[in-house]
């Protein structure tokens, strides 16, 4: 083997080179005396070859380093297919604006606006903003407001829940409000009716909250496309949910009265000046919150469309499906292809007014039957003045006319 020396080189650099300045291969060896092996060789052209595994940065939080750490969808609040802003909310639960983020509500007189706004911390263009518009300070026992996201069991198997090697999970997010507040973050095991909770404090400045939740060696999650975890933020609760004893970072069978029973819990409906801003939501394996994993808009949109999409108006008479006129009043089995494979067979709904055009007549339709699959939209609709056997286009004629396709959890 060629003898090597460590050379000071010039005043600014320290180099390792073969003696006499000759070209050669630099080899680093390791191992027991008499049994050393080449660990790293660097050719004269600079190519480095590692003989064994590079162990220094193989993992972040016990996971791979090439992305896909964040289990949450639309944590950057980029995608809002339904609407950028909705007001007067509070009477019923639902998905209203930002994709995958559901408002779960119960029996409250409080009302709020939910919006996607351009007021995120550095590096985040958007955030979710909640603004109370009607206060509710007389809180009945069964009242609640939870902001939640449900996750499929087949996307959570890496947590190894219910085994002796179950993983810790860290939830991190950026949050601020108009005033100081205390809320609760909960991971709810929908398969086994278990949950774990931690509280967090909100200030008037953007702060990153980092909450590491204990591993659960009891009760594995189902490996299917149904909801297994709900990651949720308690923002309002009556005594049914806040009248018990708060358990910090401990998995338990659900006791409803304990879920939001933290001391100093704040109701988002305590004043019409109350606001809450949220973005950069991440859930990952391990005890450390790594930097937020940003995804492109196109990728995030496709992930969200597994659960919901709506046809997009592109100008007068935008075609959203094709079919054949089965009679003068029926456009038989119209259809199109989903942009992505959906979680389950979707439900369809018509927003505004869609029309059927057969080359001469253009008449309003009403959905009659839905025979869609996870890959295709397929439906029958009623119309009028169609010609039997003609090809039919289903058209969107204005921005408010579209078809919604839903397979939410």
Regions found by a protein language model. Give the residues of each.
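Extracellular and organelle-lumenal recognition/adhesion modules and their flexible linkers in secreted
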Residues: 51-409
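Intrinsic low-complexity, repeat-rich intrinsically disordered segments enriched
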Residues: 1-69, 284-292
């Amino acid at each position: 083997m060629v003898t090597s020396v460590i050379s000071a080189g010039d005043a600014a650099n320290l180099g390792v080179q073969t003696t006499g300045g000759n070209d050669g291969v630099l080899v680093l060896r390791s191992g027991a005396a008499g049994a050393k092996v080449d660990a790293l060789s660097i050719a004269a052209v600079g190519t480095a070859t590692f003989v064994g595994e590079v162990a220094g940065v193989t993992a972040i939080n016990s996971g791979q380093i090439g992305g896909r750490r964040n289990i949450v969808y639309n944590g950057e609040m980029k995608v809002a297919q339904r609407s950028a802003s909705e007001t007067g909310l509070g009477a019923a639960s639902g998905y209203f604006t930002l994709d995958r983020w559901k408002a779960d509500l119960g029996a409250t007189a409080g009302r709020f606006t939910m919006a996607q706004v351009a007021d995120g911390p550095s590096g985040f263009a958007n955030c979710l903003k909640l603004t109370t518009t009607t206060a509710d300070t007389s809180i009945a026992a069964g009242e609640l407001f939870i902001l939640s996201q449900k996750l499929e069991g087949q996307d959570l198997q890496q947590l190894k829940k219910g085994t002796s090697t179950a993983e810790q999970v860290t939830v991190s997010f950026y949050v601020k409000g108009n005033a100081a507040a205390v809320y609760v973050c909960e991971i709810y095991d929908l398969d086994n009716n278990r949950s774990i909770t931690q509280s967090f404090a909100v200030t008037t400045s953007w702060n990153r909250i980092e909450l590491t939740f204990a591993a659960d060696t009891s009760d594995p999650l189902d490996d299917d496309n149904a909801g297994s975890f709900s990651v949720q933020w308690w923002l309002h609760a009556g005594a049914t949910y806040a009248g018990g004893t708060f358990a910090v970072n401990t998995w338990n069978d659900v006791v409803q009265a304990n879920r939001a029973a933290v001391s100093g819990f704040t109701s988002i409906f305590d004043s019409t000046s109350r606001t809450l801003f949220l973005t950069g939501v991440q859930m990952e394996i391990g005890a450390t919150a790594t930097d937020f994993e940003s995804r492109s808009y196109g990728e995030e949109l496709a992930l969200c469309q597994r659960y919901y999409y709506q046809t997009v108006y592109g100008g007068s008479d935008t075609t959203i499906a094709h079919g054949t006129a089965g009679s003068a009043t029926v456009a038989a089995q119209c259809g199109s292809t989903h942009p992505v494979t959906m979680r389950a067979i979707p439900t369809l709904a018509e927003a505004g007014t869609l029309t059927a055009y057969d080359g001469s007549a253009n008449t309003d339709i009403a959905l009659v039957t839905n025979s869609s699959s996870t890959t295709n939209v397929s439906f029958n609709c009623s119309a009028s003045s169609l010609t039997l056997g003609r090809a039919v286009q289903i058209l969107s004629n204005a921005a408010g006319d579209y078809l919604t396709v839903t397979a939410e959890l």
